[in-house]
Amino acid sequence: APHDISVALHLLGEEPEAVAAQGLTYLQPGIPDTVFLTLRFSSGRAAHIHVSWLDPHKVRRITVVGSQKMAVFDDVDSTEKLRIYDKGVQRPAYDSYGDSLSLRFGDISIPRIDMREPLRLECQHFIDCIVSGQAPLSDGRNGVQVLRVLEAGQQSLERGGEPVVLERNLRNS
């Protein structure tokens, strides 16, 4: 879950105001084998994360749903890692009775992504930051944010899925 949380925080550019987690335990009492984590943000956005070491399929997929387009990144797929869907919802003006939402379907684009070793890129970025003095994309502050979310998720699990609110002064530090 740490990587999923880190990606969500990076994509959304904010720390959640509340975290809720529910877990299912099958094999070892007190240790969830499957966890569903929900992060709620003050902007009204949400992130849903599902992790399970029991799952028979290796899944590393991120789905981003926007008002105009949607994107699916599949880290396991070696040929079509990213798909962008021109799909959205159009809201009517509601000036007449019976109007409803209409779904808009368009093209699917699959941009070319050069295949390079992620760990090598991460190490090279770190070295480049040391040499240039620039701040890395993922720094100690990001690590602390991820740990706060993980801790809130653990507290929520222990409280039966009750949302845990992150204190505002911690979210902005």
Predicted regions and their residues:
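Aromatic-acidic/polar surface patches that form glycan- and anion
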Residues: 1, 30, 115-119, 136-143
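A structural signal for well-ordered alpha-helical scaffolds and beta->alpha junctions
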Residues: 1-5, 75-76, 119-123, 150
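C-terminal helix-rich "cap/oligomerization" subdomain common to oxidoreductases
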Residues: 42, 121, 125-173
